[in-house]
Every structure is written in structure tokens, then in C-alpha cells.
A protein has these predicted regions:
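Terminal targeting signals and extreme-terminal segments of soluble enzymes
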Residues: 1-150
Length: 150
């Protein structure tokens, strides 16, 4: 990756979203990422498509969308079971493109669970446009420690 990722990137974000505190490793490379807890206790994760996220056509790269879908869908397990998880399989359908400046959102819902294997379905969208649909198979691992209050 390039040093331009170190530059401060502070887009204007929609109301209710907070920046996720993933400042190291992979999250740093693809972020910044945002999260909102909705009134019904569901969640939405999001990012603003910037130049580092794009392909040669200046649209959001499919790999970025797949990585984001992984984090958006897998978070359903974190909320449901308070456990770490790994992705076993992810099936995605690309429906539309996201351009630089698009606010991309995503969420997932648990469709089923057998032992420690979860099936989660989800959608990635921008405004009213569906960008991607996905179904993920995830394996739940150990219990997550409580979040530290800062």
C-alpha cells in the first residue's frame, strides 16, 4: 500500500454514523469504515468511496465491496452471539456500481445456525440502488471480551 493512506481522510458522514475504531491492519487499509445502530437495534456499516477504493474505471473495486460485505454480514454474528467469527464461504452478486463519492452501506441478517456455523444474508447499497447482494457462511469462534470504555 502507499503512504497516501496516512493522510487524514475526514469525509462528511450522515447523521447517526460513528467511525469504527479499526486503525490497524486490514481495516486501516480499506477504511475508514463507519457504523450506525438503528432504532430497531439492527445495524448498518458504511464507507465513502474514495480514490483508494477504486478500479481502473473509477468505480469501487469489487474486492473492496467483497471485503466490506464480509465485515457487514459477519457483524450480525458479533451482535447475536458476542463471538469472533471467520468466513467459510461468501457468495456475492454484483448488481450495480458505486462511484467515487458514493456513500455505501451494508447490513446482514442471520438466516440460520447449526452448531457454530451461521448463514447470513445481506445487502450492500448506495442511496436507493442495490450494489451487491451476498450470502455468507461463517464459523463462530471464541467469546469476544467486553469492549473497553475509553
Amino acid at each position: 500500500m502507499t503512504d497516501d493512506l496516512l493522510e487524514e481522510y475526514a469525509p462528511e458522514i450522515p447523521e447517526g454514523y460513528v467511525r469504527m475504531n479499526w486503525f490497524q491492519g486490514f481495516g486501516r487499509q480499506i477504511g475508514p469504515l463507519y457504523e450506525r445502530v438503528n432504532a430497531d437495534k439492527s445495524y448498518t456499516r458504511a464507507f465513502l468511496v474514495g480514490e483508494p477504493h477504486t478500479n481502473g474505471m473509477k468505480n469501487c473495486h469489487g474486492g473492496m465491496l467483497m471485503a466490506f460485505a464480509d465485515m457487514a454480514l459477519g457483524h450480525a454474528i458479533t451482535l447475536h452471539a458476542n463471538r469472533y467469527w471467520v468466513t467459510v464461504r461468501m457468495v456475492t452478486d454484483f448488481v450495480d456500481a458505486a462511484a467515487i463519492g458514493d456513500w455505501v452501506e451494508g447490513s446482514g441478517k442471520i438466516a440460520g445456525c447449526d452448531d457454530d456455523i451461521y448463514t447470513v444474508t445481506g445487502r450492500i447499497w448506495s442511496a436507493e440502488r442495490t450494489i451487491m447482494t451476498a450470502t455468507g457462511i461463517f464459523k463462530a469462534l471464541g467469546v469476544r471480551p467486553p469492549k473497553r470504555q475509553v
